């Protein structure tokens, strides 16, 4: 049956024209994911080629027309679509297109919401990390020994519970409930420690305290405004991002609308949708051209909602600007009144006004006190100089006296040293004589010891000789006995006697051997004693020669010592005379030394007292100078702070003005965007109501088309590459597992890699 074209019908009503625009086929968007076309599915196997005009400027129009044709052809090919009448396909395509556009809108909203959720999750994690870092820092600081040491240095907590001084908060966020709740558990410890620190700090003048309080208030206000500004800037940035996204979507939609209204797109749609199957194509194409031309023209009635939307936006912006202008006028009036008051006060300031201030009075009293102290210090300085001159003269006289006494003492000590040297020489001579006598006695004792040893050796030799002589006597006695026995007849001697004689001869032989050994030892001892005597006599001769030489030297030393002794005796006599004279001088010097020591003790006491007084005066002088320097530094610092605060106030006023202008501009933009958002929401609700009015039957028909033709249970989501038919994934996998790998519609075989997932 012939298929009716999907081109919109021209109408003078703006709502009907927009409804027809919504029923246009969805174009391919780079940001949206379009369903896979049959051409794309078959191009995987290499069965199709790119369009020859793909690189031309009108490729977007080709994509639109090809997308429509592909969707319709694919749906008709896979499901065997047959239309009973010409009205049904137009309605089904329109509903499909509307559903598709709604799905794309949902996808875009989903993407934007996911992006916002991602940003919010990042911000939440960052804030959680900041809070975690703050908690860990507090736990580390309050749990460490540093705070304990500070508490010990500050003293016990009971001492300061009575009068606890208040301290200025650098934040002053007393009106923020969340901040108070977050720090409620930690506020007691923080306030306790900070109040104790503030109490132990030195008290400053009331002017400085007032300036500090004003500075703290200004800083708190500045931080509050900065926080509000950051909040407004973040909201502005979010609104700008949403505005950019909305404008981008609006531009894309406008571009799609222009493409859908073009005559070329209508012709291509007619060519690809109807094709050669439609015999009455000329009349339809003529009607399509007329309708597209009528759609291309913009009637006057279509401008109504756009003008209303712009009018509402401008009205909201103007109302917001009026409110802002009224606020600015009131603020300017208040500021002008304050400026005039301040100018009047500043122009009327005189010297009396400055003189009546507390700061001037304090500085005046400090100046008078410093002048009095300086005059007193000058008078004491003159007295101390005079006393120093007197002490110097006394010190020079005492130094001269001490020098004379030391010279006399040195001369006396030198005389004593000379006497000690003479005594030392005499003692050394006596020591040498004693050492020589000792050596002589030692040599005599050694000679006596050697003589005794030699006598003992001779006695041992004599004993050995006696033993040898005794053995000789025994031998001779035995010989005499043998001689007597041999006088008898030897033939008559029996064997036993011969044996006894033999034994006697053996004993005689042994005795001869012992006699020979004793004689050998005696001869050896005699020879050793003789050689030792010869060496001893030679050593004695050498010793005698050495002793004679030493004796001659000792005689010479003795004569020299005697001469020096006579000279020393003369010196001793003279020194004794001098000693008797110097004893009187020493007694006099001791008396004068005692007097000088008492005088020196008195002078040292006076010097120590004057030094203490001088040190105290110098310390006071340094303290006053330091106090003056500190006061000057404090004054300069306060002047610098005043100048800095002035410059800071001017810069903050400029930044506040710029930020307020930026906030006003952002508020106007927000109001305009809110108005446009309300209008777009209204138009969206209107179009939703129009599009979803009578779509129950078409929805059921589309649902039956989207169901699988085999199981009638699941939706079609898997396409077979070899033939292009679409079934559900369960049916395809069931065919693969049962090894009946053929298409249910055309019985064409397919393998494990011959099917793909699609999205309708």
Curated annotation (Swiss-Prot):
Q: Which Pfam families match?
A: BRE1, zf-C3HC4_2
Q: What is its main location?
A: nucleus
Q: What are the GO BP annotations of this UniProt entry?
A: chromatin organization; protein ubiquitination
* Positions annotated as zinc finger (RING-type): 708-747
Source domain of life: Eukaryota
Question: Record's Gene3D superfamilies?
Answer: Zinc/RING finger domain, C3HC4 (zinc finger)
Q: Which GO terms describe its molecular function?
A: ubiquitin protein ligase activity; zinc ion binding
Family, according to the entry, reads as follows: Belongs to the BRE1 family.
Biological function: E3 ubiquitin-protein ligase that mediates monoubiquitination of histone H2B to form H2BK123ub1. H2BK123ub1 gives a specific tag for epigenetic transcriptional activation and is also a prerequisite for H3K4me and H3K79me formation.
Per its record, how is this protein called by name?
E3 ubiquitin-protein ligase bre1
């Amino acid at each position: 049956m012939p298929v009716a074209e999907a081109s919109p019908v021209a109408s003078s009503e703006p709502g009907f024209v927009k409804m027809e625009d919504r029923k246009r086929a969805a174009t391919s968007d780079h940001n949206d994911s379009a369903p896979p076309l049959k051409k794309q599915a078959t191009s995987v196997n290499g069965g199709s080629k790119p369009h020859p005009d793909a690189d031309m400027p009108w490729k977007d129009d080709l994509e639109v027309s090809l997308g429509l044709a592909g969707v319709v052809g694919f749906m008709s090919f896979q499901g065997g679509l047959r239309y009973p009448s010409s009205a049904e396909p137009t309605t089904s395509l329109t509903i499909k297109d509307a559903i598709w556009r709604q799905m794309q809108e949902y996808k875009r909203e989903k993407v934007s919401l996911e992006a916002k959720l991602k940003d919010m999750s990042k911000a939440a994690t960052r804030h959680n990390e900041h809070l975690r870092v703050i908690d860990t820092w507090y736990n580390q600081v309050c749990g460490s020994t540093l705070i304990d040491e500070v508490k010990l240095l500050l003293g016990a907590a009971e001492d300061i519970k009575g009068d606890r001084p208040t301290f200025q908060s650098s934040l002053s966020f007393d009106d923020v409930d969340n901040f108070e709740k977050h720090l409620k558990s930690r506020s007691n410890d923080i306030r306790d420690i900070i109040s104790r620190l503030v109490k132990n700090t030195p008290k400053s003048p009331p002017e400085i305290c007032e300036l500090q309080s004003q500075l703290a208030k200004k800083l708190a206000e500045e931080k509050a405004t900065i926080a509000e500004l950051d909040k407004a800037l973040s909201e502005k940035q979010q609104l700008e991002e949403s505005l950019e996204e909305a404008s981008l979507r609006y531009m894309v939609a406008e571009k799609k609308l222009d493409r859908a209204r073009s005559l070329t797109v209508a012709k291509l749609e007619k060519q690809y949708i109807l094709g050669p199957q439609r015999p009455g194509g000329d009349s339809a194409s003529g009607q399509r051209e007329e309708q597209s031309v009528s759609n291309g023209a913009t009637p006057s009635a279509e401008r109504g909602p756009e003008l209303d939307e712009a009018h509402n936006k401008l009205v909201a912006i103007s109302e917001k600007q009026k409110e802002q202008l009224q606020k600015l006028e009131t603020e300017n009036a208040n500021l002008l009144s304050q400026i005039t008051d301040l100018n009047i006060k500043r122009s009327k300031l005189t010297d009396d006004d400055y003189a009546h201030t507390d700061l001037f009075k304090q500085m005046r009293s400090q100046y008078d006190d410093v002048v009095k102290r300086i005059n007193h210090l000058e008078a004491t300085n003159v007295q101390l100089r005079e006393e120093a001159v007197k002490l110097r003269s006394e010190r020079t006289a005492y130094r001269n006296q001490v020098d004379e006494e030391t010279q006399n003492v040195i001369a006396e000590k030198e005389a004593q040293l000379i006497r000690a040297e003479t005594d030392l020489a005499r003692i050394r001579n006596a020591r040498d004589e004693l050492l020589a006598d000792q050596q002589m006695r030692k040599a005599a004792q050694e000679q006596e010891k050697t003589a005794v040893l030699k006598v003992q050796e001779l006695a041992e030799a004599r004993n050995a000789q006696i033993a040898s002589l005794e053995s000789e006597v025994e031998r001779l006695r035995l010989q005499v006995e043998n001689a007597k026995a041999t006088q008898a007849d030897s033939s008559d001697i029996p064997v036993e006697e011969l044996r006894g004689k033999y034994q006697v001869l053996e004993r005689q032989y042994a005795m001869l051997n012992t006699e020979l050994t004793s004689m050998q030892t005696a001869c050896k001892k005699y020879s050793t004693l003789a050689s030792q005597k010869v060496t001893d006599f030679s050593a004695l001769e050498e010793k005698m020669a050495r002793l004679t030489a030493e004796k001659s030297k000792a005689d010479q030393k003795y004569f020299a010592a005697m001469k020096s002794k006579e000279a020393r005796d003369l010196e001793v006599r003279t020194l004794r005379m001098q000693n008797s004279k110097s004893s009187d001088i020493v007694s006099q010097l001791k008396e004068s030394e005692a007097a000088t020591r008492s005088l020196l003790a008195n002078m040292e006491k006076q010097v120590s007292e004057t030094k203490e007084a001088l040190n105290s005066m110098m310390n006071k002088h340094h303290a006053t100078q330091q106090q003056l320097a500190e006061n000057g530094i404090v004054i300069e610092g306060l002047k610098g702070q005043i100048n800095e605060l002035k410059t800071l106030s001017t810069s903050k006023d400029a930044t506040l003005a710029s930020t307020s202008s930026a906030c006003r501009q952002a508020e106007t933009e927000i109001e305009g965007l809110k108005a446009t958002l309300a209008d777009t929401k209204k138009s969206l609700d209107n179009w939703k109501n129009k599009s979803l009015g009578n779509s129950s039957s078409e929805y059921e028909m589309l649902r039956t088309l989207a169901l699988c033709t085999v199981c009638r249970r699941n939706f079609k989501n898997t396409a077979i590459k070899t033939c292009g038919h679409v079934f559900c994934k369960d049916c395809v996998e069931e065919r693969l597992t049962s090894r009946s790998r053929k298409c249910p519609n055309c019985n064409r075989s397919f393998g494990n890699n011959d099917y793909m997932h699609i999205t309708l």
